[in-house]
């Protein structure tokens, strides 16, 4: 808030809780949360994965899933960014169309408010960018097709 003017310049206030006494409550001197997370992962002192995403509150969910897809499941960059995603925030869960309906039902049965998107690559998800570097210094990159620029993939 600009002193003397009393208004904010962007929608970052939507991440605060308007109710008093809660962890995310609005209050003097509090800064808004931002989720900008350009990230690099190293192994044996060498950069192995470089990744980030625009997408507001969905950034953290997307980056954890993309990174896990590469590190734990051995996916290529394209496979990692195009795999089905889930984003959870508060009591709401957004699932892309390709998330199995039995898993969606399980989330609903656990009391979650689930939105099962009609789209396989939903714009409710953040748009991850990813470069994976192998031991021979070959680059495998992908740009999430959920965004307007589509999918870019290069491997050399």
Task: List each model region and its residues.
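Proteins synthesized as precursors that undergo proteolytic processing into mature forms
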Residues: 1-118
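Terminal-appendage/accessory-domain detector
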Residues: 75-76, 92, 102-120, 124-156
């Amino acid at each position: 808030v600009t002193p003397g003017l009393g208004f904010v310049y962007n929608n970052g206030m939507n991440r605060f809780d308007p109710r008093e006494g809660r962890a995310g409550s609005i209050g003097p001197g509090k800064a808004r949360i931002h989720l900008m997370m350009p990230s690099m992962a190293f192994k044996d002192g060498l950069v192995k994965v470089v990744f980030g995403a625009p997408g507001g509150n969905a950034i953290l969910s997307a980056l954890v899933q993309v990174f896990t897809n590469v590190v734990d499941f051995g996916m290529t960059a394209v496979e990692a960014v195009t795999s089905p995603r889930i984003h959870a925030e508060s009591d709401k869960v957004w699932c892309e169309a390709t998330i199995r309906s039995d898993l969606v039902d399980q989330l609903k049965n656990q009391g979650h408010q689930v939105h099962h998107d009609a789209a396989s690559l939903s714009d409710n998800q953040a748009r991850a960018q990813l470069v994976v570097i192998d031991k021979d210094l070959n680059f495998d990159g992908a740009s999430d097709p959920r965004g307007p620029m589509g999918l870019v993939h290069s491997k050399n």
